[in-house]
């Protein structure tokens, strides 16, 4: 069943959809991925279970949509700021990486649930993955303004891959904390931009 795109919803539908996402995020923050059950989401959001399924095909689609909303907020926050602090492209990208890592670490239980969902092999989740990837690329491109286009695009692409792999490692217990994700990203950025 196809779900309506957020941009074609009425104001009241958009408000209900937002309440559903907020309820899912609260449950995920309280108990992680397994704590998010669609019936509980509906009850917390104050909507019928059918309403939840009208907007989201599955729990993974719901949580992936929540991560997408989080990423959109991050993009808006980063876009509202001036060029990140730092004299060099490396310093600026490390500043951005550390800000994003701190934002992720504020609610590690929630963020782990969102990352778990975004990896699901669900076509609806794939749409969220593509948009999150676009946002990550946009956010990482800003601090690299002024360097060679090919180097910037390659650096952004590789950092996005390292970020995703590091997040998977963190969620699956291969690394100790979400801060370790930031460490790996910083190391990769310094390697890729050596001499810039």
Ranges and model annotations:
Residues 46-56:
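Short hydrophobic/aromatic patch on the recognition helix
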Residues 101-123, 168-169:
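Amphipathic alpha-helical segments used for helix-helix packing
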């Amino acid at each position: 069943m196809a779900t309506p795109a957020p941009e074609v919803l009425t104001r009241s539908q958009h408000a209900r959809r937002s309440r559903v996402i907020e309820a899912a995020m609260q449950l995920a923050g309280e108990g992680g991925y397994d704590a998010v059950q669609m019936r509980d989401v509906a009850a917390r959001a104050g909507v019928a279970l059918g309403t939840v399924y009208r907007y989201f095909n599955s729990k993974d689609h719901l949580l992936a949509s929540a991560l997408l909303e989080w990423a959109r907020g991050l993009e808006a926050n980063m876009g509202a700021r001036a060029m990140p602090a730092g004299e060099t492209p490396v310093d600026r990208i490390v500043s951005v990486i550390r800000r994003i890592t701190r934002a992720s670490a504020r609610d590690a239980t929630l963020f782990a649930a969102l990352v778990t969902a975004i990896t699901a092999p669900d076509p609806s989740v794939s749409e969220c993955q593509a948009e999150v990837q676009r946002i990550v690329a946009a956010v990482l491109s800003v601090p690299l303004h002024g360097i060679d286009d090919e180097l910037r695009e390659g650096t952004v692409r590789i950092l996005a891959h390292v970020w995703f792999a590091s997040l998977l490692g963190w969620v699956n217990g291969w690394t100790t904390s979400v801060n370790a994700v930031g460490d790996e990203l910083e190391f990769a950025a310094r390697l890729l931009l050596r001499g810039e």
